[in-house]
């Protein structure tokens, strides 16, 4: 890799986004997940681990590209073997990585993740600090952000400065350029100093988003324990006046949707699950890919329901394989699953 790439200028890895009219730009963390070679064990019991690329915003960028859409990733990794590997993975998956930066002094973040015997995921993170937390405003590719039809982000970048301020600036640039702002909080409590800090920061940017995707667990957490299935709870505590779409993912059961005009539920697509990692990110990819092509579906309930069924199918396919990025589906795979479901 040349001097340019190491200094943080990734022009030699840039690919042409296939259609800047439908570009989805994802901002945030990309890291290495270490996953046990056997399932159903604690991290301490795992006999060995295999490495896999991770980080929700990066997963979404790959998911959009895998579906034939146009996507880019903005974030920071370490100037190390893992960081360069992640940049290459994006490039190989046709994601524009010209907004990636490398840090000389901090390492690429690592996460050890296991699915325990009781079905709960267990996380152990190494970020003290990691490169993704150190992205500076001066390192933002403002031109790339301004091209975004949709600007997508999470909450993990809000945990530490300077990345927190950088994310807020990036959101402002995108909003001023007319981008649709998409927010998936992707709650990871072990990363936050306290539950209170997580709740406060996640909600601090809530009213800026046009589209929000949350899980049932996140509703319970953000509302302080309220019933996640109660429409009144969602509408009174989490729906804000500027919001165009709020989606609640319900795993294998599908999703609920809320807009200014209508609300409803779209059932899940039944498959045999192997690994749920990345299912939510695949769902978001499917939804954002549809939105990038046609924003009018936010006002058309029939089209929105079709887009959400498509997103449900994206999530379903992803759980049938191990890992997030390797399992992200192609357009053909989603169409085949939907056809077989209908027949």
Curated annotation (Swiss-Prot):
Q: Does the keyword Transferase apply?
A: yes
The GO terms describing molecular function are: ATP binding; fructokinase activity
User: Catalyzes what?
Assistant: D-fructose + ATP = D-fructose 6-phosphate + ADP + H(+)
Look up the EC number in the record and give it: 2.7.1.4
Check the record and name the InterPro entries matching this protein: Carboh/pur_kinase_PfkB_CS (IPR002173), PfkB_Carbo_kinase (IPR050306), PfkB_dom (IPR011611), Ribo/fructo_kinase (IPR002139), Ribokinase-like (IPR029056)
Which BP terms from GO are recorded? Answer: carbohydrate biosynthetic process; fatty acid biosynthetic process; fructose metabolic process; starch biosynthetic process
Q: In which pathway does it act?
A: Glycan biosynthesis; starch biosynthesis
Q: Does the keyword Transport apply?
A: no
Tell me the leader sequence span. Answer: none
Instruction: Please list the residues that carry the modification N-acetylglycine.
Output: 2
Q: Name one Pfam family in it.
A: PfkB
- Enzyme class label: transferase
This protein's GO cellular component annotations are: cytosol
List the PROSITE patterns.
Answer: PFKB_KINASES_1, PFKB_KINASES_2
Keyword annotations from UniProtKB, A to Z: Acetylation, ATP-binding, Carbohydrate metabolism, Kinase, Nucleotide-binding, Transferase
Q: What functional role does this protein have?
A: May play an important role in maintaining the flux of carbon towards starch formation.
The record's section on PANTHER family has: FRUCTOKINASE-7-RELATED, HEXOKINASE FAMILY MEMBER
Q: Which family does it belong to?
A: Belongs to the carbohydrate kinase PfkB family.
- Official protein name in the record: Probable fructokinase-7
Q: Which organism is it from?
A: Arabidopsis thaliana (Mouse-ear cress)
């Amino acid at each position: 890799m040349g001097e340019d790439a190491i200094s943080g200028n990734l022009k030699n890895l840039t690919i042409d986004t296939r259609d800047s009219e439908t570009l989805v730009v994802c901002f945030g963390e990309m890291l290495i997940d270490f996953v046990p070679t056997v399932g159903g064990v604690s991290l301490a019991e795992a006999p060995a681990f295999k490495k896999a690329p991770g980080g929700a915003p990066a997963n979404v960028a790959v998911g959009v590209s895998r579906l034939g859409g146009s996507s880019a990733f903005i974030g920071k990794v370490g100037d190390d073997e893992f960081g360069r590997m992640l940049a290459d993975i994006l490039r190989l998956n046709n994601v524009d990585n010209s907004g990636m930066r490398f840090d000389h002094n901090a390492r690429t973040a690592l996460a050890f993740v296991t699915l325990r015997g009781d079905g709960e995921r267990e996380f152990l993170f190494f970020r003290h600090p990691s490169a993704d937390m150190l992205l500076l405003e001066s390192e933002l590719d403002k031109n790339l952000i301004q091209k975004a039809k949709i600007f997508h982000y999470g909450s993990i970048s809000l945990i530490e400065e300077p990345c927190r301020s950088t994310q807020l600036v990036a959101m402002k640039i995108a909003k001023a350029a007319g981008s649709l702002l998409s927010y998936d909080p992707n709650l990871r409590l072990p990363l936050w100093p306290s539950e209170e800090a997580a709740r406060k920061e996640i909600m601090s940017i809530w009213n800026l988003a046009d589209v929000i995707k949350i899980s049932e667990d996140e509703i319970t957490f953000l509302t302080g324990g309220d019933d996640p299935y109660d429409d009144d709870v969602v509408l009174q505590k989490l729906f804000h006046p500027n919001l165009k779409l709020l989606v609640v993912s319900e795993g294998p059961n599908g999703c609920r949707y809320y807009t200014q005009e209508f609300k409803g539920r779209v059932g899940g697509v039944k498959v045999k699950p192997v690994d749920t990692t990345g299912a939510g990110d695949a769902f978001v990819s499917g939804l954002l890919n549809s939105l990038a092509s046609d924003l009018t579906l936010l006002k058309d309930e029939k089209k929105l329901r079709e887009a959400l069924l498509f997103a449900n199918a994206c999530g379903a396919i992803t759980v049938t394989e191990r890992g997030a990025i390797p399992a992200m589906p192609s357009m053909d795979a989603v169409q085949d699953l939907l056809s077989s479901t209908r027949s």
